[in-house]
Amino acid sequence: MCSIVEDDFGDEGGAHAMKEDTPQPELGGNELCRKCNTEQAVLKLNQKEPQCRVCFLNYVRHKFRASLGSTKIVRRGSRVLIILTGEPANVTLLDMVRFGLEQDAFKQLRIVPVLLYVDDDFVGNTSEARLQQLAERLQVFKQFESFPAYYTVCGSSRHVALTFDGAFSPAGFEQDEARLLQVLDAVRSVSSKQDLLEQVRKQTYRQIGHALQCAYVFLSDIGVDLAKTLLSNVALGRGCSLAQDVAFCDDRYNTVKLVRPIRDLNPDEVSNYLQYSEQPLLSYSPAKHFEDKPSLQNLTAKFIDNLMQSFPSTVSTVYRTGDKLDAPKAARNECCRFCGAALDYRGSKTLFATEYSRLVSSRINAACSHEDILLKSKQMELDAERAVNGEDDQGEERVLMKQLCHGCRNIFEDLNK
């Protein structure tokens, strides 16, 4: 066994070799801002110089504007659908958009914002709890009532105008809600439930965006969210769409593109922005669906949150790994029917090994002789290869599986037939 640098690894693997980020010195009592050298500093971010309130707000807003300007993806005058959640990062994004629209002609943000709230609180909640959460969210959304806003439920292709006068009621979507709840109830594992809900949510963004004639959808994902997404998608078998799921722009559908303009922000910058903004900003942080149950996504989120406490600079390294990946290009008929990712199953050795193992478990038993095993193994290899490539003719199920990527296949196979 190799013993090179064996002292670096003990019973804890290489964990003890990683050094925690050095705590930054706290802000002095009368320390001046290192940017303008005139105003008193009010905060000091990790690995940054002390800043006053104005310089800090300019710094965060510049990161937002620079991400839009450097990519040149969002065209001037475009209608942009901004997804409402009410969470701190979402409120930060909305306030920066509002601030950009209020600037003079030279610095003005030239987009036409349209807000959309996609309601999925009917999942796992009583009607009373759902209405209570909606009322709390509306108080947060009311801060941006100058923008046109719409309401829909997850999985629906319909939308209605959203009002903030307290009389709004989510009626008329009962069939859409019942259909999604029926599908979720049929899924066995929590990991597949969460993955299914996320994919349906993205489909809803694109459908409503297309209906409202918005070519772009702004999401309020920040760096730590994308780090969780990246590692979760690896575990879920969504490697083919990994680059697009954490990229600045997800353009797998050319008609409506998902844009993440504040992906470079971290939780400290978001919380300080809400604290030091020109006017008080409310936010809402509800519990996520299935958050208290074991799943691949929840385990990954817990790992990233713990990493953020001791090694915050490592989190950005995790999600920026996605920038080094390229999404495979495929024709429209070579994309997953459910999530739109390029189909990745043909010739996959990993899927072949999984399918072959399944066939061995179902066809080989203790009563089989050595000759029978050798004879069956050749046939199982052929059957496994045909199953992976979707070349076996076994009814409508296989026809559908042939049109799904590996990640979506896992959801389908997790359904109670």
UniProtKB/Swiss-Prot annotation:
InterPro entries: CTU2, Rossmann-like_a/b/a_fold
Similarity-based family: Belongs to the CTU2/NCS2 family.
Pfam families linked to this entry: CTU2
Entry keyword annotation includes Transcription regulation: no
Name the record gives this protein: Cytoplasmic tRNA 2-thiolation protein 2
One GO term (biological process): protein urmylation
Protein localization: Cytoplasm
Pathway recorded for this protein: tRNA modification; 5-methoxycarbonylmethyl-2-thiouridine-tRNA biosynthesis
Physiological role: Plays a central role in 2-thiolation of mcm(5)S(2)U at tRNA wobble positions of tRNA(Lys), tRNA(Glu) and tRNA(Gln). May act by forming a heterodimer with NCS6/CTU1 that ligates sulfur from thiocarboxylated URM1 onto the uridine of tRNAs at wobble position.
Principal cellular location given in the protein's record: cytoplasm
Biased composition (Acidic residues): 1-11
Annotated region described as Disordered, given as residue ranges: 1-24
Gene Ontology terms: cellular component: cytosol
GO molecular function list: nucleotidyltransferase activity; sulfurtransferase activity; tRNA binding
Compositional bias of kind Basic and acidic residues: 13-22
Coiled coil: none
UniProtKB keywords: Cytoplasm, tRNA processing
